[in-house]
From Swiss-Prot:
Family of the protein in this entry: Belongs to the universal ribosomal protein uS19 family.
Organism: Borrelia recurrentis (strain A1)
Bilayer-crossing regions: none
Recorded GO CC terms: cytoplasm; small ribosomal subunit
GO molecular function, one term: structural constituent of ribosome
Name of the protein this chain belongs to: Small ribosomal subunit protein uS19
Annotated coiled-coil segments of the chain: none
Record bears the keyword RNA-binding: yes
Keywords: Ribonucleoprotein, Ribosomal protein, RNA-binding, rRNA-binding
Claim: Ribonucleoprotein is one of the keywords in the record: yes
Role this protein plays: Protein S19 forms a complex with S13 that binds strongly to the 16S ribosomal RNA.
Length: 92
């Protein structure tokens, strides 16, 4: 179910303050956050935000195409290593 329009997009307050503070600076700094549920807003475009996936921070460069998505979508938490190989092929 989508979020109500009257509520607006969710973004953590501390993350929003960091985004506003870094948007005025010429030097781009990487913003670290644990908030995977925060929505990407237009003010974040051209910033690099490191999102925590439970083990490490994954840097995400924000472009216009990512606006409206959640930060957690671009920081996978699980690693697929492939299915177990069966030994039945060689046996007969």
């Amino acid at each position: 179910m989508a979020r109500s329009i009257k509520k607006g997009p969710f973004i953590e307050k501390s993350l929003y303050q960091k985004v506003l503070a870094s948007s005025g600076k010429e030097k781009r700094v990487v913003i670290k956050t644990y908030s995977r549920a925060s929505t990407i807003i237009p003010e974040m475009v051209s910033l690099t935000i490191s999102v925590y996936n439970g083990k490490s921070f994954i840097p995400v460069y924000i472009t216009e195409d990512l606006v409206g998505h959640k930060l957690g979508e671009f920081s996978p938490t699980r690693i697929f290593r492939g299915h177990a190989k069966s030994d039945k092929k060689g046996r007969k």
